[in-house]
């Protein structure tokens, strides 16, 4: 716009000169014409420079405050940025046209960050994602992960998980908005150089569309501010990040739901979703598909005191079985489906110096309770690796969790994840029906903060679990892990800032392995590993 104004002014200044030159053309020689044109050009250049200086003074934003060295005459020694100069703090943007009665500049200052956000909002498209990848080697051949869900992730994971989300706004008028959302997730193998999907050596390379739905605002008169969605989408997940499993997880093949519905002091999330399961027979060789539906209800963000909020949640899963499916269960050895539920509460406390801690209490029965009893990963699934089986007899399990991070002074930060669980008369995937279990797992991750970009610390993990089967036989599983690490970061938070690059050395030992019989390479019960890993989200 500024350049067009300069060009227009130049044309206006040249126009009368051109007219005068035309009227005198017949009486002037060529030399005289050139002399007049050169004089007019010098005058025009002088006028343009004067106009440019005035405009520069008038519209330079007050928020831009960079120190510029000057010479003895007071002129800037280098008033124009070079290719190596830092990017400006702000840009000039033209405001909407002012009325005749309004005064002031038609330009205003906007930071580059705000300008970038404005452009993104105007386009209505966003691309978000997550992935991790890295290299590692171990003392007994290829490095192996063990009990990540109990001992912690640092120096104990060798997968290349990713999530990629595409979101496009397709309508935003009259207080109504519609967005299309697609998410892909999966894993890229970290063992072989080839990672073709479908050529799934070692079960490493896979991908799925985990989300494909439409979300809206403003279409429900009783909840205009809420997000109303339809399609393949589950309820929001809540993760214990250090242990890499979820306390709240409701997957979906398809569903309908409402999120962030303001009711009273808090907000309601509600989802009705379909998630069919493969019901197996007792040989675990034959299966049948059973249609199941889940209702997930949460009342969240309930204020308690300063920086503290409460959530109350409930989930119920039921089957819609055909007559032939029930007949297979009654007469052909297929496991009976049993409805399952989970309910609980969680409290989140944020701290004045940064950081937070989340405490949760959850109770479940039947197949969800069975997953409470898993030491490796304990997300509240209704199946085991996608397979529904087991004699579920109404047994229950309880889980108490704590996770978070806290700053200690200016140079120390500590993250934690502590879980205590027990269950009675549940089906255990290791010890069978009518099992009892009790477990505790604890991981602490203290670190020294050198600066915003560097931390050095240690992750210490320990767990122990005992199962008792129907005959009162006891089975124990336990182990510990020590990981020394140094991380390159972009902020000091351990749990909420990424990207992060870590260098680690890990010693991990299985003290007891009566539940899974796990061993590391060379049939050893321990492993020393070193490596580097990158983790990023955007």
From Swiss-Prot:
Membrane topology: Multi-pass membrane protein
GO biological process: monoatomic ion transport; polysaccharide transport
Biased composition (Polar residues): 62-73
Source organism: Escherichia coli O139:H28 (strain E24377A / ETEC)
Protein name: Putative outer membrane porin BglH
Source organism, top-level taxon: Bacteria
GO cellular component annotations of the record: cell outer membrane; pore complex
Keywords, alphabetical: Cell outer membrane, Ion transport, Membrane, Porin, Signal, Transmembrane, Transmembrane beta strand, Transport
Family: Belongs to the porin LamB (TC 1.B.3) family.
GO molecular function: carbohydrate transmembrane transporter activity; porin activity
CDD domains on file: Maltoporin-like
InterPro entries per the UniProt record, alphabetical: G_neg_Bact_CarbUptk_Porin (IPR050286), LamB-type_porin_N_dom (IPR021570), Porin_LamB (IPR003192), Porin_LamB_sf (IPR036998)
Ranges for region Disordered: 52-82
Annotated localization: Cell outer membrane
Signal peptide: 1-25
Designated gene of the protein: bglH
Predominant cellular place of this UniProt entry's protein: membrane
Chain's role: May be a sugar porin with a broad carbohydrate specificity.
């Amino acid at each position: 716009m500024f350049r067009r104004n300069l060009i227009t002014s130049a044309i206006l200044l040249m126009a009368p000169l051109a007219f005068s030159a035309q009227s005198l053309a017949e009486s002037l020689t060529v030399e005289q014409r050139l002399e007049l044109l050169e004089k007019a050009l010098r005058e025009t250049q002088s006028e343009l420079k004067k106009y440019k200086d005035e405009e520069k003074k008038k519209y330079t934003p007050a928020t831009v405050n960079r120190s510029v060295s000057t010479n003895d005459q007071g002129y800037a020694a280098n008033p124009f940025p070079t290719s190596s100069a830092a990017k400006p703090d702000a840009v000039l943007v033209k405001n909407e046209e002012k009325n005749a009665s309004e005064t002031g500049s038609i330009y205003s200052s906007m930071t580059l960050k705000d300008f970038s956000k404005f452009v993104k909002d105007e386009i209505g498209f966003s691309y978000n994602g997550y992935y991790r990848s890295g290299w590692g080697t171990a003392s007994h051949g290829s490095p192996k992960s063990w009990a990540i869900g109990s001992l912690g992730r640092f120096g104990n994971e060798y997968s290349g998980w990713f999530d990629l989300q595409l979101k496009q706004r397709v309508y935003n008028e009259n207080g109504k908005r519609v967005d299309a959302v697609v998410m892909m997730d999966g894993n890229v193998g970290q063992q072989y150089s080839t990672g073709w999907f479908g050529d799934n050596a070692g079960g490493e390379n896979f991908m799925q569309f985990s989300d494909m739905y439409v979300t809206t605002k403003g279409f429900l008169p009783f909840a205009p501010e809420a997000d109303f969605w339809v399609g393949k989408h589950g309820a929001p997940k809540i993760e214990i990040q250090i242990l890499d499993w979820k306390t709240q997880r409701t997957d979906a093949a398809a569903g309908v739901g409402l999120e962030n519905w303001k009711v009273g002091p808090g907000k309601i999330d509600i989802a009705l979703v379909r998630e069919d399961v493969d019901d197996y027979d007792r040989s675990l060789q034959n299966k049948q598909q059973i249609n199941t539906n889940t209702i997930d209800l949460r009342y969240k963000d309930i204020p308690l005191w300063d920086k503290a909020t409460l959530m109350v949640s409930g989930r119920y899963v039921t089957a819609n079985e055909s007559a032939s499916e029930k007949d297979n269960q009654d007469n052909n050895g297929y496991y009976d489906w049993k409805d399952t539920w989970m309910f609980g509460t969680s409290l989140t406390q944020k701290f004045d110096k940064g950081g937070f801690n989340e405490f949760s209490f959850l109770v479940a029965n039947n197949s969800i309770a069975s997953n409470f009893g898993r030491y490796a990963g304990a997300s509240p699934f209704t199946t085991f690796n996608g397979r529904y089986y087991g004699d579920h007899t109404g047994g229950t399990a309880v889980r108490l969790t704590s996770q978070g991070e806290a700053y200690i002074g200016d140079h120390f930060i500590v993250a934690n994840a502590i879980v205590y669980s027990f269950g009675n008369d549940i089906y255990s995937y290791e010890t069978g029906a009518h099992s009892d279990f009790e477990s505790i797992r604890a991981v602490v991750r203290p670190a020294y903060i050198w600066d915003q970009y560097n931390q050095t610390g240690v992750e210490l993990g320990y767990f122990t679990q005992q199962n008792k089967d129907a005959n009162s036989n006891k089975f124990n599983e336990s182990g510990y892990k020590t990981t020394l690490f140094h991380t390159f970061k972009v902020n000091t938070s351990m749990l909420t800032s990424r990207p992060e690059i870590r260098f680690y050395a890990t010693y991990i030992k299985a003290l007891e392995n009566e539940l899974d019989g796990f061993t590391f390479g060379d049939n050893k019960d321990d492993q020393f590993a070193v490596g580097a890993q990158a983790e990023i989200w955007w």
